[in-house]
Amino acid sequence: MNKRLAIPTLAAAALFLPACTQILLAAAPPVIHDPASVPAGTYAIEPSHTQVVFSVNHFGFTTYFGNFSDVSGNLSVVPNNPSAMSVSVSVPVSSVSTTSTKLTDDLKAADWLDAAHYPAMIFRSTSVTPTGKTTADIAGTLTLHGVTKPLVLHATFNGAGVNILDQKQTVGFQLTGTVKRSEFGVAKFVPLVSDEVQLIISAAFEK
């Protein structure tokens, strides 16, 4: 590119982009912060903006983090009756990722999560108990490594509204919980690597 042309072009772009951002912000619908005002219906997980993060205590030295992606699932919203709401989340075990390529491969193998034989980790709610205006305890079952056990996830409503980019109605939640991995037959290196696994699910649901 001709340098004489490049400089004015870049300068114009620098002026134009903030203007576009301001237009998008001005057009953005307000975010709903009251769960009772969220439109009713069934929402599907938007996988590109949903993450499942896990952490364990590693040898007593560090808290080690990893994550799963390509999550799917559904949320049934009943604004005036939160107890009637339900949620399901399915996590592909093979999507596990860590900062170590070797550890990531190990976690998929038979002596850890065994992704070949147990391809999905699935949570299905059985009841929802509100604990505050924007919080609730979601009781359900977790199926992992061929074992199904009860699990309670603590949910926090982040907000809802129309996503300005895809124009879909969107609801955001954060879910947290603790899984004792030995109860699911994944006991390798316990207690050097903690039995308790902390889960954080940051989920976007759309319809």
Regions found by a protein language model. Name each.
Residues 1-20:
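Sec-dependent bacterial lipoprotein signal peptides
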